[in-house]
Amino acid sequence: MIEIRLHGRGGQGAVTASRLLATAAFLESKYSQSIPMYGTERRGAPVTAFVRIGEKEKMVRSLIHEPDYVVVLDPLLRKTVDITEGLREDGMLVLNSSIPPEEIELLKPYRVATVDATNISLKTLGRPITNTAILGAFCRATGEVGLDSVIGAVKQQWPGRLGELNAKAVEEAFENTHVGNPRIIEEMKRTVAPVESRADWRTFKPEVDVSKCTGCKMCWIFCPEHCIEMVEGKSVVNYDFCKGCGICAEECPVGAMSMRIESETEE
């Protein structure tokens, strides 16, 4: 039996990914469980889900504390969450990241697989919902379930065009997954943010082109989080509280605000 833990954020489809993975295993005549763990989280809040897959039926239904694999749908979660907690010594991390495995910093020599699931999802689906893309990476990196089985589960979940688009995301991620060994470090860097910070919730980050900003305050007026300030007549974003909703960029009449993928600005 193998045990898998998935980390994501509300709206990225971590719970659906666990169900799709369990369904794919079932299509291969294996026993499987999908176990979500979430409460009243809003979009952007951390979510965890679990999957068990085996050749024999297991009566245990508990949460998984020592997984064989950890799958991470959001590239920024590893800054604030201990994604390797309980991971077995010979375990593997499957990460949504645009950087190669050799540049991923970890405390232990786990195997690492990376894929730029965010960009793949944006290209195929038009939205940063990374659950199906990351399953393609899981197939390629682990071989625990077959690509055809995952695609079958996807098309069963979403018949028609949406299923075809998600199947394309699975296939493209499968072809663009890289597996390797991480860079071992002695101490993991952690981001310390204000208690009420929601900075790690966002996928996109607004950036201000000061040369274009006219100080019209449209972004300041429409920002739902009140995290834009006017400094010397120009817009300044307080990134500790920005959730990356993109309203500021939509409302800016001169194109001074633009949205960039957060992980690309950090990595």
Task: Show where each model-derived region lies.
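Active-site cofactor/cluster-binding pocket
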Residues: 1-200, 211-214, 265-267
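Short Cys/His-rich Zn2+-coordinating modules
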Residues: 194, 200-206, 232-234
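Iron-sulfur cluster-binding cysteine motifs and their immediate structural context
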Residues: 208, 218-236, 247-264
